[in-house]
Amino acid sequence: MKKIRPLTEADVTAESAFFMQRRQVLKALGISAAALSLPSTAQADLLSWFKGNDRPKAPVGKPLEFSQPAAWRSDLALTPEDKVTGYNNFYEFGLDKADPAANAGSLKTEPWTLKISGEVAKPYTLDYDDLTHRFPLEERIYRMRCVEAWSMVVPWIGFPLYKLLTQAQPTSHAKYVAFETLYAPDDMPGQKDRFVGGGLKYPYVEGLRLDEAMHPLTLMTVGVYGKALPPQNGAPIRLIVPWKYGFKGIKSIVSIKLTRERPPTTWNLSAPNEYGFYANVNPHVDHPRWSQATERFIGSGGILDVQRQPTLLFNGYASEVASLYRGLNLRENF
């Protein structure tokens, strides 16, 4: 696989950068107008950093057995673990970036059932142990780009989605793959309270074209940093599609269904003019409310010292995936 442009040491997110001290915040308030250029959701998340010195404590996941294929040992500089497990979008547990780590401990991941159905010859079901033992696991270092114009680099652990789909034997009628998150309002407060959950319709649903789902980069993810996923990152299994914006990475999946028609997707249903079905990372197609030309790679020194870097087409994976969209107008099909 072609090497992807490495980030520099200056891009690394330092351990001390994630939450600002109260004293730093007081100094920062005098020039906080700079934050107003960020997306509205990001502005709210910056305010959540002001709540105190203590960062949320992520549950410790069990160690996983996995390989580290040479093809995925990228030169990319990793975002530290506490950033990835402490700065999340998972509206089922609240709108602020710190809410999932603070609230997702209520999520019950054992037992778990993942059903594969629809336009397949051999539908089947995976249980909790199957998720980490049915298919060989491997670590892959991927860029992660949020539609809010911030990014991370994460060592995910999982298996290619095509292995799961191939075992189900898709029929000739299968054109798309539909995903669905667990619906458990008692464990996921955002599903019960529209104010907590951002007014979205739950359960969260996502979808891919079948060829996108079968691409070797598309990963069913069960771990991060050598351990099982913590709840706030989508335990026990989530989707990672590294050339797409992060909201395509549906979490805590209970259903994968192959379909003839394009499935509905949560953010597209909520705001179709802002969030398309494809959601490919594209610096030339702005969000209606902010630019996608650059991104914030959270760095040392806190929120006021974050450096911006150019956004890469398909998040740096163009050589692998651009052929999937040959002849497709990416501005119209965003």
Swiss-Prot record:
Mo-molybdopterin binds at residues 88, 91-92, 146, 181, 233, 238, 249-251. It catalyses: L-methionyl-[protein] + a quinone + H2O = L-methionyl-(S)-S-oxide-[protein] + a quinol; L-methionyl-[protein] + a quinone + H2O = L-methionyl-(R)-S-oxide-[protein] + a quinol. Its main location: periplasm. Predicted to be exported by the Tat system. The position of the signal peptide cleavage has not been experimentally proven. PROSITE patterns: TAT (PS51318). GO terms for molecular function: metal ion binding; molybdopterin cofactor binding; oxidoreductase activity, acting on a sulfur group of donors, quinone or similar compound as acceptor. One of its GO terms (cellular component) is periplasmic space. Pfam families: Oxidored_molyb. Its cofactor is Mo-molybdopterin. It is an enzyme of class 1 (oxidoreductase). The keyword Metal-binding applies. It comes from the Bacteria. Binds 1 Mo-molybdopterin (Mo-MPT) cofactor per subunit. Residues 1-44 form the signal peptide. It is found in: Periplasm. One of its GO terms (biological process) is protein repair. Its EC number is 1.8.5.-. InterPro entries: MsrP, OxRdtase_Mopterin-bd_dom, OxRdtase_Mopterin-bd_sf, TAT_signal. Keywords: Metal-binding, Molybdenum, Oxidoreductase, Periplasm, Signal. Belongs to the MsrP family. Heterodimer of a catalytic subunit (MsrP) and a heme-binding subunit (MsrQ). Part of the MsrPQ system that repairs oxidized periplasmic proteins containing methionine sulfoxide residues (Met-O), using respiratory chain electrons. Thus protects these proteins from oxidative-stress damage caused by reactive species of oxygen and chlorine generated by the host defense mechanisms. MsrPQ is essential for the maintenance of envelope integrity under bleach stress, rescuing a wide series of structurally unrelated periplasmic proteins from methionine oxidation, including the primary periplasmic chaperone SurA and the lipoprotein Pal. This is Protein-methionine-sulfoxide reductase catalytic subunit MsrP. The lineage of its organism: Bacteria, Pseudomonadati, Pseudomonadota, Gammaproteobacteria, Enterobacterales. The gene is msrP.
